[in-house]
Amino acid sequence: MGEVALKYRLMPESPDSDTSAIVDSISGVLPEDASLGAHEIKPFAFGLNAIIIVIMGIDREGFATEVEDALNGLTNVQTVVLEEQSLV
């Protein structure tokens, strides 16, 4: 089995959401075999900032679904979009 990199765009609920706190909480909700790689906060629209993250983990069945479910459970996150998926 190889490793997979998943690139997500997380959209906070409002422009007032603390994006740093959201990033800090990500590692705590991920499956055991997943880790937070790079992250970046980018202006999106109407004062909202998108959080772009890369999650690394083992390429196994159900991995992306588990990660996405965990990210959807984060406080102050409105949407989670998988933008890219690739083997490393």
Predicted segments, located by residue:
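Long, contiguous binding/interaction regions
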Residues: 1-88
